[in-house]
């Protein structure tokens, strides 16, 4: 690749600063809430989510819509993403590899103390419930599986357009 010496380092830095990657700590503000869409589907991704969340939001409790696949290190993901005081809505991912939401709730309760966890039948139902039970300024995160991000983002943009 040919180097273009006419592009300043500042321009390159600005370009990187403005770059977004859908589903990688994608922050959307709307519906009077802050929504975070992040795959966080393995231990490293969950650790990255936790580091970024802590930098931006400190210890602010959040509502998490979560699915995790059976073959993932569920406890490692949960330990990083979920903190005491959080509320979690476990949902199925649209794959036969998904963990059953009821089982996921058990793992969450066993792994993180003082967490509220329940199931929802779908990502859309969980987001509607999360929205209903949160208030202006609250944080709703969707993570644990890349499989659920498309439906979550679609729900968000649909609700924003109405």
Residue ranges and their predicted role:
Residues 1-87:
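Nucleotide phosphate-binding/pyrophosphate-handling subdomain across enzymes
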Residues 5, 57, 109-114, 160-161:
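Short helix-capping segments at alpha-helix termini
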Residues 34-36, 43, 78-139:
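C-terminal helical cap/extension that packs against the catalytic core
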Residues 126, 148-150:
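Short, active-site-adjacent cap segments at secondary-structure transitions
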Residues 145:
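Active-site-proximal loop/hinge segments that shape catalytic or ion-binding/gating pockets
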Residues 157:
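Nuclease catalytic cores that cleave nucleic-acid phosphodiester bonds
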């Amino acid at each position: 690749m040919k180097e273009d010496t006419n592009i300043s380092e500042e321009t390159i830095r600005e370009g990187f600063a403005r770059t977004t990657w859908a589903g990688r700590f994608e922050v959307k503000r709307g519906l009077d809430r802050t929504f975070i869409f992040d795959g966080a589907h393995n231990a490293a991704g969950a650790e990255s989510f936790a580091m970024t969340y802590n930098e931006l939001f400190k210890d602010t409790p959040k509502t998490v819509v979560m699915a995790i696949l059976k073959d993932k290190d569920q406890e490692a993901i949960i330990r990083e993403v979920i903190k005491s005081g959080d509320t979690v809505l476990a949902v199925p991912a649209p794959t036969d590899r998904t963990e059953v939401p009821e089982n996921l709730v058990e793992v969450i309760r066993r792994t993180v103390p003082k967490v509220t966890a329940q199931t929802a039948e779908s990502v859309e139902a969980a987001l509607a419930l999360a929205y209903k039970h949160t208030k202006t300024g609250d944080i709703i995160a969707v993570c644990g599986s890349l499989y659920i991000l498309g439906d979550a983002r679609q729900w968000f943009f649909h609700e924003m357009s109405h």
